[in-house]
Amino acid sequence: MFTDLLHSSYFSLFLIVALGFMLGRIKIKGLSLDVSAVIFIALLFGHFGVIIPKELGNFGLVLFIFTIGIQAGPGFFDSFRSKGKTLIIITMLIISSACLTAVGLKYAFGIDTPSVVGLVAGALTSTPGLAVAIDSTNSPLASIAYGIAYPFGVIGVILFVKLLPKIMRIDLDKEARRLEIERRGQFPELGTCIYRITNPSVFGRSLMQINARAMTGAVISRLKHQEEISIPTAHTVLHEGDYIQAVGSEEALTQLAVLVGEREEGELPLENTQEIESLLLTKKDMINKQLGDLNLMKNFGCTVTRVRRSGIDLSPSPDLALKFGDKLMVVGEKEGIKGVARLLGNNAKKLSDTDFFPIAMGIVLGVLFGKLNISFPGGLSFSPGLTGGVLMVALLLSAIGKTGPILWSMSGPANQLLRQLGLLLFLAEVGTSAGKNLVATFQESGLLLFGVGAAITLVPMLIAAFVGRLVFKISLLDLLGTITGGMTSTPGLAAADSMVDSNIPSVAYATVYPIAMVFLILFIQVIATVVY
């Protein structure tokens, strides 16, 4: 009966997942495989003839890659602008060193060209690369070599990613916190203080005339004139001895003191009719609108003192484009705040709701984009493939945020659930598929091709780790994402993801993966047509 159950793909799938999680929780000297253990169990099951259908693996792959792209999209373009050049150089180093290693070992051991390009595709776990290798050589040797190199291409990257922090003696959680502090440095922490108006140059002038926000970056949220506290408008006039309360970075608050007068600590209390509330932006119509376009002071008599996004406080400048899930700190009369709440949506339930239409539509667009075939001079051609197409489309849609009524975003819990589900399906299928021929390919082709494939996997990662840390001095989290992206290794990214609560590896992976995929295909075509 148990044998019959093993031939049932759904039973085998969940058994592999359960055993994988059990194995993944075992720690040896602080090192564990986590979710990556699923692929090791799958390899064992595959060796004994258990197969998970390819369609389930592809389904899991598109879910995993799509959710990676949706999460990484907003940070992808920022990362590309700020450190993209460095990550791309490391990626090119990975691809070129893999190909040079392959060509060097080809001549050293007399390996035929079809086997070499198959080894490169397998060592870097690139299915599009295999397709190009077979097409370019018209030889079955490419697929045999791919099958030999592929298992270590998967396992080797996982183990390298797991061991690298231990070898470098770097605590990934501390590294993530350090990078978070650096990231916050780009968005200085906002503070609040009050000022006594003592500068004669602003006596009798309105806030519009002194242009405090443009000159300093601080937001004036309250005014005390004589004994009355109010929310100032652009036309509010300042008088000697008035008090104002402002919100901004330390630099902005210091500059405001130079402009208006003496700085004091504390806050001005709100009147009984006034409130300060944190409101969520959940209404689709408001997404991508600039804060200044809402005219909250004119329409509701309210002021936004800060905007919180992804754990960071942003200064509420008029040109700030609002995003779904932004939390706006609003000060005003009770009725005015109610009006702002209606305008923004302020519906916490919508943050956890999951609309499957954008997910399905995004994946459809990604699959279609992956089918495109782009031709280059000299007879070279490139197709993004399933993984590349879905990732590129997800990155673009996530950065756009909204198209008409369609919201291209996903709540954190929903993203995490779909990502984990997709990953487990993918790892189970890939493992059983690689495991079924593992022993046979060793017996048929010996250890030489396996050793060459292992070298093609390891050498680029060692070079990338050395250059990334010692030459470019990038963070280990960025390096892990770049290595897994440069090696086009989705299981490797999963291993990095499971080690730290940070999306930095995912962003780096998404930054370099499309580039790695394109250049790997081009390099394989060059080797297949030029190297003899």
Curated annotation (Swiss-Prot):
Chief location of this protein within or outside the cell: membrane
Record keywords: Cell membrane, Membrane, Repeat, Transmembrane, Transmembrane helix, Transport
Compartments it resides in: Cell membrane
Pfam families given in the database record: Asp-Al_Ex (PF06826), TrkA_C (PF02080)
Organism of this sequence: Bacteroides fragilis (strain YCH46)
Membrane topology reported for the UniProt record: Multi-pass membrane protein
Protein name, per record: Uncharacterized transporter BF2680
Family membership noted in the UniProt record: Belongs to the AAE transporter (TC 2.A.81) family.
Annotated TM spans: 7-26, 30-52, 59-77, 87-109, 116-134, 139-161, 356-378, 388-410, 446-468, 509-531
Gene Ontology biological process terms, A to Z: potassium ion transport
Entry's Gene Ontology cellular component terms: plasma membrane
One annotated GO molecular function: monoatomic cation transmembrane transporter activity
Domain RCK C-terminal: 179-262, 263-346
